[in-house]
Amino acid sequence: LFRSYSKRCVVKPEAKESKLLRFNRVAQEAAKQSGRGRIPKVGPVQNLNECDFSGFDAVFIAYEDEEKTTLKQALRKAFGEEKGKSDEGGNDIAIIIGPEGGFEPTEVESVLKNSPAAKSVSLGKRILRTETAGMAMLAMLMYELEG
């Protein structure tokens, strides 16, 4: 899990080790509670353009100006018509959610250019709040990949 910031972020990053430890502890406890086989790791805050997505099978960036590709379509294209592997199968998927003001078009273009596995996706007709978009996207992924 990358904690990134971009041009339109209202809150600027704080490099506090205690927060990083807390976030990793929360991720571990949540994974244990939900019966996940793999525990997500939370990394330090970094600029979106500095994030390295090379180790991921797919990278989906939720972009409010994406009009053609939904998350479902991008998943099918990335992993075939059959549903992708479940947690046990080991697909590594990165999701990128924008800040309160949305992404700058150049930020989206940079991620798509620098990450071969990246795809810009729509989460629907409505623009969601940052905190809602992340949960909505994770719920969509769970539904599509885990049935």
Feature map (PLM): residue ranges:
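Short glycine/serine/threonine-biased micro-segments
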Residues: 33, 96-100, 122, 132
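Short glycine-/acidic-enriched loop or helix-start segments at secondary-structure transitions
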Residues: 11-12, 71-72, 105-108
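RNA substrate-binding interface of SAM-dependent RNA methyltransferases
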Residues: 2-61
